[in-house]
Amino acid sequence: QYGAKCVFIKHETKPMSSSDIRDMLPNRRGASYLPESVYARIIKNGDYDAKPELYWLRDKAYAMLSPKRVAHVVGCEAEAVTLANRWGEDPENAAEAGILHDITKKLVLSDQLILCRKYGIINDNAEEENVKLLHAKTGAALARDLFNISDEVYDAIRWHTTGKPDMTLLEKIIYMADYIEPNRDFDGVDKLRKLAYENLDEAMALGLEMSLEDIRSYGQEPYYATADAYKWYSDHTAQKQ
């Protein structure tokens, strides 16, 4: 009647309501029902108490890594989940921290410092000159900005390089998973792996001691947080014996 030309497009629909999707989001589901940009914004803002689906989070994290680093992160996530199941930690939090712990590792010092200024990160003189120290702090801050991670996951990323005295269970799991994941190959790693599943605090003491010895073997002075962490875990485990 009006000269219109109608085109019928065949498209498979999914029976779904907005309330169904809102119910999915806190349970790490729903990404496939939303446009990528919408889902990313929901995760960033923490809308509807959303938690990121782990496959989606992996894609985002791996895009920020070198190919060699991806293999390490895959191993770290798997090790973190296994340790979490062994010691009674939430395996999804362990997976999330494992996936995200190195997202700024490939950035050069100048880019690390740009992120520090952006997120208001205060550093001491040693940190200002050391990418290895900075990436734990900038990685935690960037992960919180992009993915609205919990305080527990933030702290696990924040302390995964140096350690610190009296760490939470999740912090210890990520520190140890980073150290002993299957791609790691160094003298003593098998002993450390075994101990991590028998006595996590003793494994922390041994791992921190090995880290201090490695740093000193290069003629460098260990960062104070690592030395403090070793003293705490060494004293703590000695008191229990």
PLM region descriptions:
Residues 30-54, 213-241:
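Charged phosphate-binding loop/patch that engages nucleotide di/tri-phosphates or the phosphate backbone
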Residues 26, 85, 162, 213-220:
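Generic secondary-structure signature for well-ordered alpha-helical cores
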